[in-house]
């Protein structure tokens, strides 16, 4: 299935400081705040986590540099995404054959903000996810560390 309508199913509630989200339990998460979900056809859907979406802000545009059937590697830039707060390269987190980009985003890039774990998926790849991808519990610990660092930086800026 690559329509992104897959219900993420069971999720854990995550809260740290003022950041709150639901993290799908069956997904894998990359250190770069992408999620990866295995599909019934053996491919993997890839999207941005709610944390990444929050850092970028409301999405306004995106583009891909890889065509369907192209071979992609871990860490390869496959495209870019622009939010009101920032623009970011999209790095591949699955090694293999690039299957598709989400066609719905062409008309509604805001799906990334509104349904980042479902219809707001970015692209799909047939292959193997990055070995650094982690389960939901390890990702929650990574979020704890990341958010704590942001809060420490903010506190240091206030002191200056």
Locate each region found by the language model.
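Flexible, gly/ser-rich surface segments that form the specificity/activation loops bordering the active-site cleft
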Residues: 83
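Non-catalytic terminal segments and appended small domains
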Residues: 1-74, 88, 97-160
């Amino acid at each position: 299935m690559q329509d992104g309508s897959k219900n993420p199913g069971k999720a854990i509630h995550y809260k740290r400081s003022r950041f709150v989200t639901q993290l799908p339990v069956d997904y894998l998460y990359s250190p770069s705040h992408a999620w990866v979900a295995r599909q019934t056809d053996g491919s993997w859907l890839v999207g941005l986590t709610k944390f990444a979406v929050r850092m970028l802000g409301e999405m306004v545009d995106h583009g891909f540099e890889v065509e369907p059937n192209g071979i992609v590697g871990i860490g390869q830039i496959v495209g870019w995404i622009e939010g009101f707060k920032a623009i970011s390269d999209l790095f591949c987190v699955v090694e293999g054959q690039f299957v598709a980009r989400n066609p719905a985003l062409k008309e509604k890039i805001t799906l990334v903000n509104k349904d980042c774990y479902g219809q707001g998926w970015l692209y799909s790849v047939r292959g193997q996810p990055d070995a650094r991808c982690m389960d939901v519990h390890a990702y929650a610990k990574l979020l704890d560390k990341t958010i704590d660092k942001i809060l420490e930086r903010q506190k240091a800026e206030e002191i200056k």
